[in-house]
UniProtKB/Swiss-Prot annotation:
This is Small ribosomal subunit biogenesis GTPase RsgA. GO terms for biological process: ribosomal small subunit biogenesis. Monomer. Associates with 30S ribosomal subunit, binds 16S rRNA. Residues 33-46 have a biased composition (Polar residues). One of its GO terms (cellular component) is cytoplasm.
Length: 354
């Protein structure tokens, strides 16, 4: 069987355009009337609290939350965006739509993840810090932490590592987990341990969140929603159990939502993901996002060094000298190895949808 030729850039653009048309057609509410300009009031500022297809919940200047249509000229709107809205002079009670989003202010930061169709998809914006939540159950893994750290470094959003469910930590597991967390502290990442169930460490987390816009990131089952509920009980987010069969958490939060904390600051709770794909990043960028590698990058004997068993590799020499952790070095190679696999999966998906 002959191998399929890679898709051209033109084919990829047409595929994405057709996909966007399908999304707009499927998500458009034919029963929702368009708001006419004559029925709209003056422009005012607002913040996107949550996005639902072609609608968004907007917090207005006076603190009210209203559901608005989104102008078709707006190609990207996510939770955390600062926007210009116009509210309907007379509320359309039957539709539940109270206004329209006219424009989006420039973002000072954004958190993105790769999308099989659209390349890179922004999932939240105007974020001051990322709280990377890991836990004892599902089993603690540094691979997921390192993927989120790469994403944070790539977007230049300061990360904080949170270990949740420490009430489940056994004496047998504790030494290895403590050693792994210390490696992150040694290279400059702040690490905190909490138990959302027992309330341990929550006051420290509240202080970290004060006067900032934060986002919780982490795989399903690590207790992000439970942690949010402990910090803000009135949020009433759904909480899922850990699957008995797989040990993986059930997806609970269904859409990113911005929440106000009584102690000050905002929190964006975003849907959990089982793996944070990074195939949109070139290998050189991934290496730069491992912050302890930076002093050694460019010091290899050969410019095309793969940082494996290549002779004269500065990174490998740093690992051997104890200047770079072997675990982090191995996770770097796991990420690099996954890049081609994920790119191939995207291309296969694209070809299948033709």
């Amino acid at each position: 069987m002959s191998k399929k030729k890679p898709l051209s850039q033109g084919q990829l653009r047409r595929m994405r355009a057709n996909h966007e048309k399908r999304l707009n057609r499927d998500s458009g509410d034919k029963n929702t009337p368009e708001l006419q300009d004559s029925s709209l009031g003056p422009e005012q500022s607002g913040t996107v609290i949550s996005r639902f297809g072609q609608h968004a919940d907007i917090e207005t200047e006076d603190g009210h939350i209203v559901r608005c249509n989104i102008r078709r000229t707006i190609t990207s709107l996510v939770t955390g965006d600062k926007v210009i809205v116009r509210l309907a002079i007379e509320s359309q009670a039957n539709s539940g739509i109270a206004g329209i989003v006219e424009a989006v202010h420039p973002r000072h930061s954004s958190l993105s993840r790769p999308d099989l169709y659209d390349g890179v998809k922004i999932i939240a914006s105007n974020i001051d810090q990322i709280l990377i939540v890991s836990s004892v159950l599902p089993s603690f893994t540094t691979q997921i932490i390192d993927r989120y750290l790469v994403a944070a470094e790539d977007t230049d959003i300061p990360p904080i590592i949170i270990l949740n469910k420490i009430d489940l930590l056994t004496p047998e597991e504790a030494p290895a987990i403590e050693e792994a967390l210390k490696r992150y502290q040694d290279i400059g990442y702040p690490v905190y341990k909490v138990s959302s169930k027992l309330g341990e460490g929550l006051e420290t987390i509240k202080a970290l969140l004060k006067d900032k816009v934060s986002v919780f990131a982490g795989q399903s089952g690590v207790g992000k929603s439970s942690l949010v509920n402990a910090l803000l009980p009135e949020a009433e987010l759904l909480v899922g159990d850990v699957s008995d069969n797989s040990g993986l958490g059930q997806h609970t939060t269904t859409t990113a939502k911005l929440l106000h904390l009584p102690s000050g600051g905002d929190l964006i709770d975003s849907p959990g993901v089982r793996e944070f794909a990074l195939w949109h990043l070139p290998a050189q960028r991934v290496g730069w996002c491992f912050i302890e590698f930076r002093d050694f990058l460019g010091g290899c004997k050969f410019r095309d060094c793969k940082h494996g068993d290549d002779p004269g590799c500065a990174l490998k020499a740093a690992v051997d000298a104890g200047k770079i952790s072997e675990d982090r070095f191995n996770n770097y190679h796991r990420i690099i190895a996954s890049l081609d696999e994920q790119r191939h999966a995207r291309q296969f998906r694209a070809q299948s949808d033709e």
